[in-house]
Each structure stands twice: as C-alpha cells, then as structure tokens.
Amino acid sequence: PILATVLKEILNKNKINNTQLLNIKKIIKKINKFHEWLIQFRDPKKTGLVSILHPWESGYDNSPLWDEPMKKVKIEKNIKYKRGDNKVVNPDYRPLDIDYDRYVTIKNNLKKMKYNPKKVYKSSFFNVVDVGFNSIFLKANKDLVILLDKFNLNKTKINNYIKLTEKNFLKLYDKKKESFFSKDIRNNQKIFIPSITNYFVLFADLNNDKINKKLIKSLKRYNPKNKYFFSSIKPNHKSFEEKRYWRGPVWINCNWFIHKGLKNKDWFFSEKIKKKTIQILEKKGFFEYFSCKNGQPMGAKNFSWSAALYLDLMLNKN
C-alpha cells in the first residue's frame, strides 16, 4: 500500500496545474478509501496492525517468514494448476512445487468465499501481521495525512489509526533480539525469522528514537561479511538459500526502503547503502535479484522495478 507515499513524492517534485490538482484530489479520495478498507477488513479487532491473507500480498512470496504458517496449510486434494515461472527462470531460483500447492490451496479457499472481505479474515488458511507490510502501510498513512491536509480533506480517521499503530507496533518488538518480528494470527505465534523486511520499520519512521537506534545497530550486524547487501534472510540462519528467490538473494527494493528510512536517522549509512545498490546495478545489470556473496545476477532480466529504483537513487540527491 505505497500509493500515498509515491503520490506525495510526485507532488513534491513537480509543478502541478489546477486541472491536475482536481484530478489528484479525486485520486487521494480513492487512496483514502483503500486505506479505510484495509483498516476495516484486515484489522477488524482494531489493533492498529493489518493482516495479509496470502504470502503473495507481502510481495516476498516464498520467504522463510511463511514456512511455519504454510506448513499448517493442508493441501487441497487433486489440486490442478500450471506453473510458468519455472519455465522462463532457472527452477533452482524459484519457489518449490509444494510452495505453489499451498499458494493455490489458499487462493482457492478465498475464491470459495468469493473473496468476501467480511468472511476471509476469519476463514483464510493464512493470516499474518507482517512487519514489512505494516511498516509500508504506516508510512503511507502518514503521507496520506499530509495529502488530505493539503487538499482540506478529513484526516481524523487516519490520524487516529496512526496513533493506534504507533502504540501497538511495539508489541512486535523483541528487546533481546533488537528487532521486530511478524505474528502468525491464525496460529497465535511470533515468527522469529531474521528477514531484512523486519527493518522496514525504519522506513515507517516509528516515533521511538531509542528503538530506531537499536534497529540500526542490529542492521549493521546483519550481513557485514558479504560484499553485497542486504540479503533477504540473514546469511547465518538455517533457512538461508543464496539463490532461491526470497530466501537469500539481495533485492533492490529492500535496499531502497532501508536507504529511505535511514536518511534522517543515519545519513552516512544511508548513503553507503545507496552507493552499493547503484554499484551492483551498474556492474551486474538490471536483474530481478542478486547473490549477496558474489553479486551473481538472477531472475528476470531488464527488471522494471530494479531500473525504476535505480533512476530514483540516481536522480534524488536529497
């Protein structure tokens, strides 16, 4: 849910005429409705934290974050589907067939409920409060408030939700490990997997300097021995796989989120991440993801979000 953040950036960097402003106001109203929809249907208990109901909603499909919740998904009998992803990309880099069995099982269950938002929260085979998703949503809500204020639209509901999120986000923090961890709502279990997405909290600008400093300290220990960073999973963890999709490789968007989040907290570290990210793209090409050990490019070639974020890093000096 990053639309509000992107739109705020567009408005900050461009001259907008009156006709465009009218259209943008309509877009902001639609974004506001989307955010209110997420709050209503993905956080029915009003905790300040929204759930994802399928690993695909996170964007990091086969992350080890989902291993335990997914193990509890009973695969549908006689399940039928055709994979195309492992035909165009090396299968060793892609999720396993058993992963897809579970993805499709979850999807088919949602389909049986006709994706009714009132039903799926309770009945989905997968229900996780993800740190990464909620970090992006918190930042988007903060940016949405700025947009609503700019166009004299009501911001009370979103403002109140931000306060609730700021308060309850801390329940996901582990003092000993100095990191945030997602929670499996369906099985009522914390997910103690060292994923780089746990550090997206820095992007959310959580109003807690003490925790932010501890997060940065922890992040600097994440994979210091590797030339390329950040690996999607901490390299010394048992679930780490150097080349398999979201189980180890470096993703440009993860670096981008953390670079942006550190700019007003540790500028030098932020610039280091920016420099290293630009270097790997210029040296290895615009691929989907890369090995943290040797920078080997993997996945799809000419990958658009790698290219788009490269442009953003190159053109944004602030």
Question: Where are the predicted features?
Answer:
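Well-ordered alpha-helical scaffold segments within catalytic/enzyme domains
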Residues: 2-19, 135-153, 200-210, 256-267, ...
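Extended, well-ordered alpha-helical scaffold segments
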Residues: 18-38, 140, 151-170, 210-222, ...
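Short, local alpha-helical segments
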Residues: 239-244, 255-257, 261
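Aromatic- and histidine-enriched alpha-helix N-cap/loop-to-helix transition segments
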Residues: 1-5, 26-30, 128-140, 192-196, ...
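A generic secondary-structure signal for well-formed alpha-helical elements
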Residues: 7-15, 31-46, 141-148, 152, ...
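Internal, well-ordered domain-core segments that constitute the primary functional module
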Residues: 2-70
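Extended glycan-interaction surfaces of carbohydrate-active proteins
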Residues: 47-128, 164-250, 276-318
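C-terminal transactivation domains of fungal Zn(2)-Cys(6)
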Residues: 113-168
